[in-house]
């Protein structure tokens, strides 16, 4: 009923009836004078009533407000412009602006009804709606048109002068600059981009003045103080400008003023002097000036492509310094694998420390270190390994390689074998040193060479039972697996340990079976090792030797025992890998000699004639050993380095085993003895096996050739694997993928890749694309 009456009387209440009551309250609010609660609420209801009853009430209110606001702003303008001095003007403006801007949030509230009637918006008290209020917009637009647009350049220039003064060390009220910034940010009427006026004016002026300042200051400072002091200056100024920017520039999320300012500063302070600063890098790296390098790194990391020259300098230094140190120590490290590995680790730790302290282990610098260190590890300057390859009876040489993998394997052997080195270390220390070897191994390109030598040493340790710690031996296999060694290689090593354990059980059964039987040799004195040919991969070459009767008679007994337990398997005897202990008795004393089967066969030639002299020719007939093996074996008995009195004597004297003739005479040294601390020992034990290889010269040649042949097969397999998957591929992409597949075994040489590609084309596995000879197509 009440609503219908109001509507019936619509038009009877006019704007003019209420404005006289509203007007004084509006003026009080503009002047920041206090109003009563009743006046505040009356203003809300009067605005609502006028908008509801007077058809043109909303427009009239809007116009009246505009006039009042304009009048108020004119008064403020007069107060501001009464100051001629720019700084005084700025201060006056900030005072007036702060008061006015506060009222921009208060005055629009009672006039929310205007939003509904003029714009058709639903009434809301949300802050976001208040910011879009037409009254607020009216206030800000009027301020902008009446005051700000007329004096903004003076205000802006004054603000920039204050910032300039601050850069020179003068103090001032920072709120003056902040106030100007706030004006720019809040006076934009563009709803699509509310920061447009700020960006086009204040931000641009701030960036331009900053750049001008440092374009003048920076070159002067550099010239007077030098590069190293300038870097400190630039770093300090960048930090200083960032703090200043956070104070004076807009920091809301959608605004990137601070980032733009920092880019401007970097251009003026760093990019402009990039070449001059980087010229110092190489010298700093050489002098290990980590603090200065860290400073340079932090500066150059802000510059596009600023880091690349530093990475190049680091790589060049690691390679040149690393190789220089290796060459300087060449005399020692080429003959001592322990010293060699220690030298490599010293270099790695030195360069790693440099990267950590100077570049905070930044991944880019770690990659540069790895690349350069790999070059040092795989360099063939100091010592090289040449792997021969025979094709159709012709001996060919492959490209020389670093001997590093061989020396790493030798060092592992020193740690894993019973040696003076391993005896003075605890298990934990041995483990730590092996882990260090694995670290270096990661950088070795041709890991297949390491595998070959490591396996040869392991074979020797397992056969001679000279491992320092069996648990560490088996752990080493798993560590090799963890560092990415090929699974087939690691599995073979694991199988070798399995064979040794199985052999222990077989020995126990053999001894149990024959404990009451009379054999040529007591069962307790025999240790048989049954080894899987696939895992141990011995050469096909068999070396014949005439064994002593006791051993010859034992062999059938072992074969019969084995066949009872494992039918269908065939045993091949490898005397080359066998060894034993014999007792040497003379008037001086009694000594146990650890010998190879070949040494044993030679010494047994004197068993029935201990004082006779036997010629080289007759020893060859007695032992039936090949010439090369007999010479090598005899030399180990006449010139064993650890003995002062040798087991055998010979005449005439020669410089090497190659100089033995058919007529060279050999005899047992009846005065043989072991001497310790210059005293003759009546009893003792000596290992005469020493570093004698458990392979022949020809076997070693075959193994070296085998490495190359296996590389050829692996390369062919990898190419086919890639071609099957890709079907069609460019030569460059093929080489990249090929290296990725083979990198855990070896780095294929370009020559080898080319040869295998030609072989596969010839045998119609792949073909060249007719349209592009550098593209290959798989032929199913």
UniProtKB/Swiss-Prot annotation:
Pfam families for this protein: Cullin, Cullin_Nedd8
Main location: nucleus
Pathway field: Protein modification; protein ubiquitination
Entry keyword Zinc: no
Regions crossing the membrane: none
Subunit (UniProt): Component of multiple cullin-5-RING E3 ubiquitin-protein ligase complexes (ECS complexes, also named CRL5 complexes) formed of CUL5, Elongin BC (ELOB and ELOC), RNF7/RBX2 and a variable SOCS box domain-containing protein as substrate-specific recognition component. CUL5-containing ECS complexes specifically contain RNF7/RBX2, and not RBX1, as catalytic subunit. Component of the ECS(ASB2) complex with the substrate recognition component ASB2. Component of the ECS(ASB6) complex with the substrate recognition component ASB6.
Stated name of the protein: Cullin-5
Species classification: Eukaryota, Metazoa, Chordata, Craniata, Vertebrata
Gene name of this polypeptide: Cul5
